[in-house]
C-alpha cells in the first residue's frame, strides 16, 4: 500500500497543525483510548490505577506519554512510508516489552483521526481524513510485519 504525493501532502499539512499542540493532542488521544477501550489500560503500568477522566486529565505522566506517542508518530509520518529504520525500535519495544496487540494500534488510529477532525474541522475534511487513515493503516501493517520478525503475533 502506498500513498500518493497528494495524500502525503494532506497528512503532513494537518500534522503541521497538530504539532503546534502535540502534548495536548497526544494526551487527549491517550485518555480517549483508555476510556473507549478500557481493556487497553492494563498495558499501561503507570496508568492502570487511574479510574476517572479527571485523574487522567490531571496526570502529567499521561500528558508526557501522549507527547511521546505523537512525537514518534510524527517522525514516522514524515518519512512518507520510508519508515523501516524509524519503525524498527518502536515495533521491537511494543512487541517484546509492552506486548501491544495490533488491534490496539487500530483503536488508537481511529481515535487519532477523530481527535484531529474535532480540533481542525476546517482543515481536516474527507480527503485528508482518508489520507490519514491510509497512512495509519500503512504504519499498522508495517508494525505487524515487524512484530512477526520479532516473534510476536500480537
Curated annotation (Swiss-Prot):
The Globin domain, residue ranges: 2-148
GO molecular function ontology, one term from the record:
oxygen carrier activity
Which reaction is this enzyme known to catalyze?
Answer: Fe(III)-heme b-[protein] + nitric oxide + H2O = Fe(II)-heme b-[protein] + nitrite + 2 H(+); H2O2 + AH2 = A + 2 H2O
- UniProt KW Heme keyword: yes
Location in or out of the cell: Cytoplasm, Sarcoplasm
Q: Which UniProt keywords apply?
A: Cytoplasm, Heme, Iron, Metal-binding, Muscle protein, Oxidoreductase, Oxygen transport, Transport
Describe, as the record does, how this protein assembles with itself and its partners. Monomeric.
Family named by the database record: Belongs to the globin family.
Recorded protein name is: Myoglobin
- Species for this entry: Alligator mississippiensis (American alligator)
The coding gene here is MB
